Amino acid sequence: MSNHRIERVGMEIKREVNEILQKKVRDPRVQGVTITDVQMSGDLSLAKVYYTIMSDLASDNQKVQIGLEKAKGTIKRELGKNLTMYKIPDLTFIKDESIEYGNKIDQMLRDLEKRN
């Protein structure tokens, strides 16, 4: 399957999941979750959904992960209504560490700048 189609489907799923989390999922554990990326498998049967949250607390991270797993059925059902795909991919939610990593590097650079 063409990479262009895989990327398009991933972008569409990202947009839809963000909207579903904001409008359809009422679980307070997933409030403030932002979907940052979706990586699709080559056959479009699996989607790795990367997310961030505003809190740095480990307990909040765990609560969000549990909330997303509980909401997975609702999210897939809504994706089925909104997307014209034969089969909706299985969703795997993964916390996106790249923003925290970038913030850590920025802080290290600021600390170096202060020393000089």
Swiss-Prot record:
Chief localisation class: cytoplasm
Subunit structure comment from the entry: Monomer. Binds 30S ribosomal subunits, but not 50S ribosomal subunits or 70S ribosomes.
Keyword Lipid biosynthesis part of the UniProt annotation: no
GO cellular component: cytosol
Protein name per the record: Ribosome-binding factor A
Subcellular location as annotated: Cytoplasm
InterPro entries per UniProt: KH_dom-like_a/b, RbfA, RbfA_dom_sf, Ribosome-bd_factorA_CS
Protein's job: One of several proteins that assist in the late maturation steps of the functional core of the 30S ribosomal subunit. Associates with free 30S ribosomal subunits (but not with 30S subunits that are part of 70S ribosomes or polysomes). Required for efficient processing of 16S rRNA. May interact with the 5'-terminal helix region of 16S rRNA.
GO BP annotation list: maturation of SSU-rRNA
Keywords of this entry: Cytoplasm, Ribosome biogenesis
PANTHER family in alphabetical order: RIBOSOME-BINDING FACTOR A, CHLOROPLASTIC-RELATED
Family that this chain belongs to: Belongs to the RbfA family.
Cystine crosslinks: none
The keyword Nucleotide-binding appears for this protein: no
Molecular function GO labels: ribosomal small subunit binding
